[in-house]
Amino acid sequence: MKKNAVFPIVLVLLTVLISELHAQLETRTVKSFEKVIVSPHIQVVFEEGEVEQVSIEDADIPPEKLKVEVNGKTLRIYLEDAKFLTKRVKYKAPYGKNKRPMYQGTEARVVVHYKNLKRLAVRGEQQITLNSPIERQKFRLLLYGESKVVFNKIAVNKLRTTIYGESEVEVKSGTIEKQKYLAYGESRVNTLGAFNGTTRITAYGESDFKVNVRDKIKLSAFGEALVRYEGDPNINRGIVIGRARIKRL
């Protein structure tokens, strides 16, 4: 009786394990790209490699609904019917018909292997992690929504970032000679881990910045922006309307 009871359990465990391995091993080779656009519901880890490809590690949806396309030099990763915004579908509620996001609570995890990455745009609420060092002259970052982007290490001459919404940017280590931020909303930026020459910030809203600056900080703000810094930079206030503050850490 005990053997008969154990066998179904083992069979179920093996089935689950095999299913997970299949999901983790699905890899799609793509054409060469330099720019990436990540749409909602997709958590991405970026790693530099010799082959440009996208590996699906986990997904709450059938793999065919995860779209991977390269147009020109731009790689797009999105869920079906959620290329820009998540499609809303009707459902029956106790008080009548209503609508909700098609992929409510859904998330896919992928790893993007790249050779050259110079521009990244993210839409949604997911976390994006750049595991490999970003080493180049210029890097462009655009965020829409409430996502979080983490750079483990960076070495760039110019970093230009535009944020719409409540997104977060963190740089753990490296060097950024010149960084420029344009922020709309309640964004949060922490680049204390990176040595920086000059920082220029234009903020609309209640953004929070932590920076490590050697030479100069310039702030233009409309709202209640807060800039906290390490280093001994010159402070240049541009147009400031509201309660913008600059403090040494």
Give the location of each predicted region.
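Bacterial Sec-dependent N-terminal signal peptides
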Residues: M1-R28
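Acidic (Asp/Glu) and glycine-rich low-complexity loops/linkers
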Residues: Q24-R123, Q127-L142, K153-T162, K172-Q179, ...
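Short, surface-exposed interaction patches in beta-rich subdomains
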Residues: V169-L249
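Short leucine-rich amphipathic alpha-helices used at interfaces
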Residues: L21, Q126-Q127, G197, Y204
